[in-house]
């Protein structure tokens, strides 16, 4: 079999030509752009010397405001001021269950759109406007056009969310070199590969609590290879959620059940300010409408404990996935503005029993890592380290009985390609439905459907003779292509998995947890399903044989065979695996004798009229 070569998308074919590459952290709360100048990464400022661009877009009557200029409109005009658009990326309207002040309308393929003064705007379009601001900032600062960009995404972004990010970049006029997981970018920024001269492998935890997402990754650096051993996270857990918990507490203190959109915006702004101030102060005052509340550190810690517990639970699970103990971890790296909180740092310190690394500005570390990677991919840097991201969830296809055949397991390093042969179930089958799924369960009904396509033109053959090679290929951005090819005829078909909307905020977490909780149950159920499929195949083959050669059996033999057949059918109505297997064996006792009679008949038929000398010569 030929080796499959997968190159980094967009990599420069002219390595000696210096080209402008940027790294972009498209964040929930803030976004940044960085580049490598004279061999050193640098976060680029705007004309007012600001590094952070708040991820906010306001649509006015005749103009659009971005970033800091859009901030005042969060309270003054909340319905037309889009904040934290990243939380809406790749989601359906039904998936968005958290409170927000926007008027969402359905659009094609159930993707939501914001009803604004400037018309309907999709999350992709709004993200594109933020990316365009960062692209313009880079080109103004560098006085040169940008040739390519690496854009970071949460490790737990699924296929739809990654594709939405790529679409936004395309709308912004950016050439995407690669989508890079945010924790992986942080590891690059810290230069953890510089410790590769040590004799032992080095393991690192990247704890990334941003504005809207949480990711934790365990990375290992060994013999020049930088590999993500395991990832976990939550697509809707971050600083925004801490703000909402403070708002919930404040409402309870003030005996308020429901807030208007305008008042809710006031509470959110006050909560965010209080959270930030508590990083350096013991207590703060929240000015809310006509009331003032005092919030101290112990109270704040108790308020957000439920969110911190979720992050710690994910950390422990990822450690188990990587088959590591706490003593195997050399360093813990903090990423994301929310890790500035003393309460977050305290929780991380306690669970990992060591002081976490936070020497690089946690708001900037991801953009810095992205810029270093972009500089490598564009061809400006020859770095010896190899960076391997991983698939967050397993990928497979549906087989008979509604079972999942896994081709690529979760936490497999990407880019990756896997091939496997399948065959037909029925005689004369000329088409095969390929149903692609994502998840950790053994039954299709418990996994997420990613797409379907049909391979037509399979030559009619006896069941089990056709050879269909199915290939799953995941590129460096985590985007999946599935193809199928029939060996004898060469007919083929494929699908690029680009679903119209992604997992809901809890779906990714749910798929993983259910996979662990139901592992034993799924194993038993899979055994039952496989046993039933095999039994049904025996019955179908017997039915076909009886249609042709039933006359070979006398009445007693036929009655015995039919009795065994009906007994097996009755057992298939239940779920006793041993009883089904016993019934299959009893059927085979009778069907094997029938098969011998059939074989003799067909040999006699084949040799009829053939002289012995002719037969000997032909052999």
UniProtKB/Swiss-Prot annotation:
Signal peptide: none annotated. Keywords: ATP-binding, Chaperone, Nucleotide-binding. CDD domains: ASKHA_NBD_HSP70_HscA. InterPro entries: ATPase_NBD (IPR043129), Heat_shock_70_CS (IPR018181), HscA_NBD (IPR042039), HSP70_C_sf (IPR029048), HSP70_peptide-bd_sf (IPR029047), Hsp_70_fam (IPR013126), ISC_FeS_clus_asmbl_HscA (IPR010236). It comes from the Bacteria. Transmembrane segments: none annotated. Disulfide bonds: none annotated. Chaperone involved in the maturation of iron-sulfur cluster-containing proteins. Has a low intrinsic ATPase activity which is markedly stimulated by HscB. PANTHER family: HEAT SHOCK PROTEIN 70KDA (PTHR19375). Belongs to the heat shock protein 70 family. This is Chaperone protein HscA homolog. It comes from Acinetobacter baumannii (strain ACICU).
